[in-house]
Amino acid sequence: MIGYLRGLAVIVEDVEFARRLYKEGFYGRFLGYDKVKRDEVEKINAPLILGLYEALYLAEKGRLKVMGEDGREVAPEELAALGRERMRNFDEIYKIYKYFRDLGYVVKSGLKFGALFSVYEKGPGIDHAPMVVVFLEPDKGISATDITRGGRLSHSVRKTWTLATVLRQTGEVVLLGFGWARL
């Protein structure tokens, strides 16, 4: 099916296809709607807005054909190039997104938790995200204060605060999770 590239988003106008994408993996968000539970999807009559990470992932999997404003198909490599051009650390962050998606997790924005991603086992409205993921730039450190802040945040929302990075030498995704424990 088709999505239309608009800036750094891809719009899926075909409502039936949009519903299917959302039901199958909670991809994107419906225009004008905040949170939509799986059993409410059939009532939605709005386009689906996909972020660049989601659109690239679906295009690489052959589930989505992205069309540019000029009417020509935008290849996954071109989507990645656009991301690199407009977003800092695009390749590393996409690799982390893809890592979780390939493991079967649902990956949504973690902005409301001060994180890059919220990662669900089943999906929003079905379960709570067990972890929030923060991107740590390769070769950069993190302060003890930042770790404490992340740990406190994750404790208050009952989630594992997870640092994620990509090793420059191997391209491997590395995760480090923090949680609170009563001693």
UniProtKB/Swiss-Prot annotation:
The keyword Flavoprotein does not apply. Keywords: Lyase, tRNA processing. The active site is at Y120, H128, K159. Signal peptide: none annotated. It catalyses: pretRNA = a 3'-half-tRNA molecule with a 5'-OH end + a 5'-half-tRNA molecule with a 2',3'-cyclic phosphate end + an intron with a 2',3'-cyclic phosphate and a 5'-hydroxyl terminus. Its EC number is 4.6.1.16. One of its GO terms (biological process) is tRNA splicing, via endonucleolytic cleavage and ligation. Disulfide bonds: none annotated. Homotetramer; although the tetramer contains four active sites, only two participate in the cleavage. Therefore, it should be considered as a dimer of dimers. Belongs to the tRNA-intron endonuclease family. Archaeal short subfamily. NCBIfam families: endA (TIGR00324). Endonuclease that removes tRNA introns. Cleaves pre-tRNA at the 5'- and 3'-splice sites to release the intron. The products are an intron and two tRNA half-molecules bearing 2',3' cyclic phosphate and 5'-OH termini. Recognizes a pseudosymmetric substrate in which 2 bulged loops of 3 bases are separated by a stem of 4 bp. This is tRNA-splicing endonuclease. It comes from Pyrobaculum aerophilum (strain ATCC 51768 / DSM 7523 / JCM 9630 / CIP 104966 / NBRC 100827 / IM2).
